[in-house]
């Protein structure tokens, strides 16, 4: 490993230590993605789910190397699906809002964009940290200032997708509010601002039908450049705003995912497939993503991960 890559590795490690709750700061390299048994639903005297009584503990954060809550990305409903079942969509969003408010004590409302509910965080740093943590749990999420949008769809089921969304916001808020001291939260805010000065955050594009062709074309160009530079082939798995890259092992995908998030590039994984964002507005030619993946892969090779 040359001097430049050693310095880059040291910086990535320092950033991850800053972002992770204290109990993970000295153990995240060795953490294994072992899932916990899913908690069942509990009901109150009114017959409704008692969301705030379900969890006694949570599995490890995906950010720290734990298993993502969802094996595949949980996405928001489409305008067409919502328009076809408005009554059911209203039921789903009402239950999502009730559950989120019970487990986080944060206010919620319907997002201005159909397919999402909006959660108001305590400040922008909290929203930015939760954004990264939730993406890594494989649940779609968007941020506007100190507000987060979480996915909703008329086909969401109480014991499946609704529970998934409530669980993920409960889990990530638990680690932010209960395991991240105020001084560390301030340090995380400083880190985010420093990373923005270096390179603005790259998030997946919000894809409308009219812009899908441009996003897919950019994804193809990014995939070709990454394959040439790193040897990582693109995955057949497709999601709007994401490009999948095949990694040789789960350990490799986890390491690259964290390295990218520490480089201000949102990332997640599904098994051994690493997903990186595609955003024609925020990263028009994909240069930031390609550069960040290339640097992370060089360090991974030097560490024997690739």
Language-model segments: residues:
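PLP-dependent enzyme catalytic core of the Aspartate aminotransferase-like
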Residues: 2-58, 148-209, 273-306
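Short charge-dense sequence patches
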Residues: 40-48, 77-86, 112-124, 203-213, ...
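Short amphipathic alpha-helical segments
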Residues: 88-92, 126, 161-164, 214, ...
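Conserved PLP-binding catalytic core of the aspartate aminotransferase-like
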Residues: 93, 106-133, 219, 232-259
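Generic non-transmembrane alpha-helical segments
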Residues: 95, 99-103, 129-133, 137-139, ...
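Hydrophobic beta-strand residues in large extracellular and virion-surface proteins
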Residues: 100, 119, 148-150, 226, ...
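Intrinsically disordered, low-complexity regulatory segments enriched in Ser/Thr/Pro
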Residues: 128-155, 160, 253-280
């Amino acid at each position: 490993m040359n001097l430049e890559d050693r310095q880059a590795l040291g910086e990535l490690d320092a950033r991850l230590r800053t972002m992770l709750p204290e109990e993970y700061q000295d153990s995240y390299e060795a953490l294994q993605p072992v899932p916990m048994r899913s908690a069942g639903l509990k009901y109150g005297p009114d017959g409704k789910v008692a969301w705030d009584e379900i969890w006694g503990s949570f599995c490890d954060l995906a950010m720290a190397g734990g298993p993502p809550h969802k094996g595949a990305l949980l996405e928001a409903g489409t305008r067409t699906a919502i328009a076809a079942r408005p009554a059911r969509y209203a039921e789903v969003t009402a239950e999502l809002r009730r559950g989120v408010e019970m487990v986080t004590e944060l206010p919620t409302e319907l997002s201005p964009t159909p397919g999402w509910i909006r959660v108001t965080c305590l400040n922008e740093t909290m929203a930015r940290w939760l954004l990264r943590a939730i993406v890594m749990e494989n649940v779609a999420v968007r941020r506007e200032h100190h507000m987060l949008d979480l996915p909703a769809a008329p086909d969401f089921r109480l014991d499946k997708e609704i529970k998934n969304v409530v669980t993920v916001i409960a889990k990530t808020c638990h680690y932010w509010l209960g395991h991240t001291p105020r001084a560390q939260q301030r340090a995380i805010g400083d880190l985010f601002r420093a990373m923005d000065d270096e390179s603005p955050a790259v998030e997946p594009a919000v894809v409308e039908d009219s812009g899908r062709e441009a996003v897919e074309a950019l994804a193809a160009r990014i995939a070709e450049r990454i394959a040439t530079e790193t040897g990582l082939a693109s995955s057949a798995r497709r999601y709007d705003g994401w490009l999948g890259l095949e990694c040789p092992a789960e350990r490799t995908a986890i390491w690259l995912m964290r390295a990218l998030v520490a480089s201000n590039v949102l990332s997640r994984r599904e098994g051994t497939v690493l997903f990186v964002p595609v955003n024609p507005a925020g990263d028009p030619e994909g240069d930031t993503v390609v550069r960040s993946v290339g640097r992370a892969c060089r360090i991974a090779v030097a560490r024997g991960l690739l």
